[in-house]
C-alpha cells in the first residue's frame, strides 16, 4: 500500500476549478463564521454588503452567540434578503467559549458537522436551495458537507494574509524539525521561511506550536482546518493589496481566486452609511456605553489613549492594577474598555472603583466603560493612540482611522501583527518584554504620545491610512465585492476539483512520519 506520508512535498500543488455560474436560479449564500466576536463582526459586514448587492443571504451563528448579538431584528428589517439561522455549538451553557480555552474549538470542529448537514438538507429541501457557502477558514466541516451536497465553497479569513501564509509553512517547519521546539524560548526566531526573514518568531505560529507546554493536538487540528480551505473555490480577505502584497502573491499560488475587500468596516460604512442598525453597531456582545463619546468631545485633539483588549482576553487582578497605574502615571487622558468578565475570578468594576479612590488623579484623567463602539472611538479626533491586543480587526480599524498603536499582544495572530506594526509598517510600538508592569505601560504610552518618535510614527501611519481610505473613496475595494456577486454560483452544481497534490489532505498524513521522528520528541 502506498505510503502517502512519503510524498515528495516539493511537488505538491492544488488547483481547484474556478467558480462557474451556470443557471437562472437566484443565488442564495450561507455565511458561517467561527463563533468569536472577531470573526462574527466581519462576517456580518460581508453579509450586509452581499444583501445590499441583491443576494439572498443566510447568516448562520451558534445559538449561544445569536442570543448575544443585539437587535438582529433591526438588521433583518434593514436588509430584507438577510436571514438568520442558528446551530448548537455543542457546549453546556456554563462552559467557557473563549477560543484559548479549547473546548469551543474542538466542539465546532467535531460536533457541529451533523447539525450543519441537517440544516443544509433542510434548506435545500425547500424551494430556494443554498447555491454557495462562505465559511470561516477555521471551520473545515462546512467544506466537507458542501462537497457532499455539491455546493461551491468560498473561504473567508478574518485574519491577515500574512498570518494565513504562516499556516501553509507549518508542514515545512515540522519536516525540518524547527517545531515543536525543544527549549523554553517562546520568542526564538524561526529560520528559513520565505517572506519572513528575521521577522518570524515562535510565538507568531498558530495554535500551540507557539506554546511548548500546550496540547499539540490543538495545533494539528487547526492546521488541518486551514489546509482544508485549499479546496475552496476562492478566498476572501479583509486586507488591501498595498498592505500585504508579498503574502497575497504567496496565497495566490494556493487559492484559485482571492478577493481583498479591506478595510471591510470602512467599505461597509461608505456603501451602507453609518447606521445604528449596521453590523458594526449590532455585533457587539456587550452593551455599548455611549457616554464615552460625550467625554471624548471634551478632550483636546489627539490627546486621548484608547485602551481595549478585545472580546475574549482575561487578566489577573494584579495585572489590571499594573495597567491602571501605568496609565495614570503617564499623565495622558485615557478611555479604557474593561469588560465585566475581563478579570479572572473577580469583578473589574469593583477593582477600578477601588483604584480610582486610591489614586485620585485617575478619576480626572480617565474614563472606564464596559464596552464602546471601537470604530467610532478610533475615528474621534480626540483619540491619539490605541493600546491594543492587536487583533486583526482592531489593526485594520486603527489603520483606517490613522491612529498609532501601542501593541500588547496575547495570542493567535496578535504577536505577528504587533511585529509588523512596529518593525515593518512603523505605525506603532511593540512591548519589548513579557511582563505586566506599570513602568512598561507608562513608557509605551509616553513613547507613542510624545517626542520625535511620535512624529515619525504618525507620519508613517498617515501614509498607510491614506492608502487604505483611497480604496474606499475611489471604490477600489468595492470592485472585488461586485466581482464576488458575479462569481457567486447561481446553481448548487459543484465545480469539479482536480487534485494534483495534497492541498487540503489530512494534516496528520503530511507530517505523520515527522511527528514520530526524534527531532520532535527531544527534551
UniProtKB/Swiss-Prot annotation:
Tissue expression profile of the protein: Highly expressed in young fruits 15 and 34 days after anthesis (15-DAA and 34-DAA).
Applied biotechnology: C.sativus and L.esculentum expressing S.grosvenorii genes SgSQE1, SgCS, SgEPH2, SgP450, SgUGT269-1 and SgUGT289-3 accumulate siamenoside I and mogrosides III and V, thus providing a strategy for vegetable flavor improvement or for heterologous biosynthesis of mogrosides.
SUPFAM superfamilies the record matches: UDP-Glycosyltransferase/glycogen phosphorylase (SSF53756)
Catalysed transformations (reactions): mogrol + UDP-alpha-D-glucose = mogroside I-A1 + UDP + H(+); mogroside I-A1 + UDP-alpha-D-glucose = mogroside IIE + UDP + H(+); mogroside IE + UDP-alpha-D-glucose = mogroside IIE + UDP + H(+); mogroside II-A1 + UDP-alpha-D-glucose = mogroside IIIX + UDP + H(+)
Pathway listed: Secondary metabolite biosynthesis; terpenoid biosynthesis
Comment field (misc): Mogrosides, the major active constituents of S.grosvenorii fruits, are a mixture of cucurbitane-type triterpenoid glycosides that have been proven to be powerful and zero-caloric sweeteners and can hence be used as a sucrose substitute for diabetic and obese patients.
Name under which the protein is recorded: Mogroside I-A1 synthase
Organism listed in the record: Siraitia grosvenorii
Gene: UGT720-269-1
